[in-house]
Amino acid sequence: MGISEINYDIQFEPLFSNFTFKGMEILSFKTTPSNKFVLNCAEIKIKKCYILSKNKTIDVNFKLDAKKESLSIVSKSKVSGKIKLCIEYTGILNDRLLGFYRSKYTDPSGKTKYMATTQFEAADARRAFPCWDEPATKATFDVSLLVEKNYMAMSNMPVRKKQNFGSKIIYEFERTPIMSTYLLYLGVGEFEYVETKLRNIQIRVLTTKGNKNKAKLSLELTKKFLGEYEKYFGIKYPLPKLDMLAIPDFAAGAMENWGAITFRETILLYDPKTSSTKTKQFIAEVISHELAHQWFGNLVTMKWWNDLWLNESFATFMATKIVDKFYPEWDLWDQFLEDAMNTAMSLDALKTSHPIDVKVNHPSEIREIFDSISYDKGGCVLRMLENFVTDKNFQKGLQKYLKKYEYSNAEGRDLWKS
């Protein structure tokens, strides 16, 4: 694909009245001469589409293929150099916990409420906007959200500008660093939050109304662990802010969207009066796991999903390492051997097991490899490797790897070379 310098400038307008959203996208990129562009696209209706090239508007024909989840855009003549692909479309604010979806909950007064949130990993950004929805096709993003005045809008970056737009408010966010589509985040809801700072990095834990008093532990852990990861990796956290969001309806335990990590409410909220130490430990481990991803996965991303273990094994291993440093009394490495190793070995003994590096051809196969082999067996292998090469050499190797491949993609063999 002769495409480079990709930027998505997208405005989203979620409509809770009929659970749909409107999208306006300007996709800018540099291309070698071509008259056909194929994007990933699913469950989206295209209203308008054209190309801007050298200050001229070029008409196009477009075709959606639901089975291939693709949008083919064809112009009569070839275009090259810097061009803009302009698309106006509508989508579904679904209730399937993927793509751009609605999360239903009850507020303290017993009233039913909705928020809009996203889950794009592994291949569901295409349900929110037409894009090249693959981890290796990194881009920058300029996001804006048009929302009702009683709502607050969130994305990966801080708000650059906020202004009235008719009866609504438009939130414009700063441009993201170069990153994969699956790490983009959009959130619209009636949030409240607690906040702190690490140097000039704003850290917040956001909850639905009536729950922020249960967010203090998570805030404290996030600040502690983030600083420790910076020290260990030798690379500062690169974004100006970090939000941790408690989502009522959430399929995964948590998701490491860069600068806007989402969690199940039960995993992020802690009530010291009623919650156990076991709950506190679980919250600490999940927060640590997601923070590890801000480097392993977000800063350096696997080229394709066969190397998912590069994300998940490291996050599993590092999560235990960092939490153990602050809470040695929990004996986390003993628990790791008992839980992670036994789970992984039991699964690995079955005929249906697979290598850590597993072949993936189609997005539908990706979800199947988010299992104990990718997470726990990989984590155990890394623990064994660290023990073999020594802590210091292991750390040096990781620092070298992260520095070499920051803001780009890597494969398993790139790590071994480091």
Please report, for each region that a protein language model flagged, where it lies by residue.
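Acidic/His-enriched low-complexity segments
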Residues: 1-244, 266, 271, 370-373, ...
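Hydrophobic alpha-helical and helix-loop surface patches within well-folded domains
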Residues: 173, 199-418
